[in-house]
Amino acid sequence: TVELYFRACDNGKLGITQSIGPGYRIMSKVKWLLGKIAIIKSQNYKHAKASGIEDSISRKLAFAPHINIGVFSLEKDSECWRVWQKNLKKTLAKGKVFGSEGLAINIAVYHDNVDVEFLPLKCNWITSHLLPKYDSKENTFVEPYLPNEKIGIIHLAAGLWKDKKDMRLNKDVKIELDTLE
């Protein structure tokens, strides 16, 4: 997995994973008003509006697959750093600190069109979207669908919740995982 990140950022590209893939059931939350008007609640849109990002960019981000910035790669002289910093200044000016760096990179990719190499989910597996399976023969976590690729990085973004307790904060929280067997 780490090797893929090194390869992905060749020639100034951003190496990163989108939060979309097989088995993901929801792309975005939507609240329906009077049964006909959709109030978009996607992470990108919500953060963009709170940060004062103009409507045209906010709307473009609304249904773009969210890019989680928890794991990424960039060469030190990549142009993407400058674009990201420009966007980060905008998002921090009016928005909250939490989520600003992610919003800035989503704007860089979907609005500024920086060069990007999208990596597979196994490079940044977000458990709150979909739990992995466990391969007890290989003693490793794998994607829950065929061909059950080995997961390289597991990310507890948004936590794992059970009985209103977050596994990141409460080590007594236990979850059940399906196995390959």
Q: For each of these PLM feature ranges, what is it?
A:
Residues 1-181:
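Glycosyltransferase catalytic domains, chiefly GT-A lineage
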